[in-house]
Amino acid sequence: MSFLSSLFAALAVAGQPAAGPVTIFASRVLDGKGGQLKNATVVVDRGRILRVEPFKVDRPTYDFTGGTVMPGLIDIHVHATAYLNRQGRMHTAADGDTPVQAGYAAAANSYRTLLAGFTTVASIGAAEDKDLRDWIGRGEVPGPRIMTSLEPIADPSLSEAQLREEVGRRVDSGADLIKLFASKSIRDGGAQTMSEAQLRAACGEAKRRGVPSIVHAHSAASIKAAVLAGCHQIEHGVFADKEVIDLMVREGTFFGPQCSLVFRNYLENRQRFEGLGNFTAEGFAAMEKAIPLAVAVTRMAAATGGLQLVYGTDAVAGAHGRNADDLLCRVRQAGQRPMDAIIAATSR
């Protein structure tokens, strides 16, 4: 299967004038839901797929004979505005980079992500994501469609009423979804930080306002609390067990475990992060220990029938453009069937 063929098709369509149909022929067309057609033509008009013809039209606009075309990939967990600064370190507000430099870096991140075949991402963690989302949406800069949570809600001291207010403030400011922290970082052990009641208040308000809630949760206890609270999606889950995965199945909760990219990126670029916040010797040791656990959880999740398994990488500074790495990890290390991995990354 050729990811490149899919990418070229997407870029070709994006570069066409608004008027007039574009026809894309490929020897194999995947629908993102498990089905496929051989020797088919995708017909696109004004940026929208009109139909798929089960034959080769005369003189297609783009001919990918021998290649595969599939829907654009979706990464449900990135940090689009996180980048490495001029000193080769993770950008922080105090590193001297100007807003213009930060903006160009964010645009470069998005372009790299698009070139990797990802046409939709959820960027969950920064207010700056909103401007990037809007610029891409207007066609001013190339990049994937962005959904953003703006700033995450991470303060465990907030009351239920305050959490509802925080959710409402973000939605009113243009958030497409809400991100909550129900546990500590993996670098700090991943223990639960918010109660089920707090999560119910926040996730309930998000649902009332018509946006999904995505919860950072590593420990089994924090995952269980978020699922029972009715939250829409769990991210990470390094310490998830069969009990909480089965609970997610029963409750219809979406689950986005990271197979390895986020941890490997931090470890491979240790000197770029070390000394910032919880990027300590202990923090790096915790991430190294997390890799086999994350692969095992991904394997368990992939083998669990009925689980709403989505695809998210937690791509941060240094990882943009490598978003497909975890697809390979899911298939090669976690044993997920290739078509199931594609479905998770295109249709859910």
Regions found by a protein language model. Give the residues of each.
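Bacterial Sec-dependent signal peptides at the C-terminal "C-region" and cleavage site
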Residues: 4-21
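Histidine-rich, glycine-flanked metal-binding segment
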Residues: 20, 29, 33-70
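Metal-associated gating/positioning segment near the N- to mid-region
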Residues: 64-138, 197, 221, 226-229
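Active-site environment of divalent metal-dependent phosphoester hydrolases
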Residues: 81-84, 121-131, 184-188, 218-224, ...
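Histidine/acidic residue-rich metal-binding segments in metalloenzymes
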Residues: 162-182, 189-255, 269-272, 276-277, ...
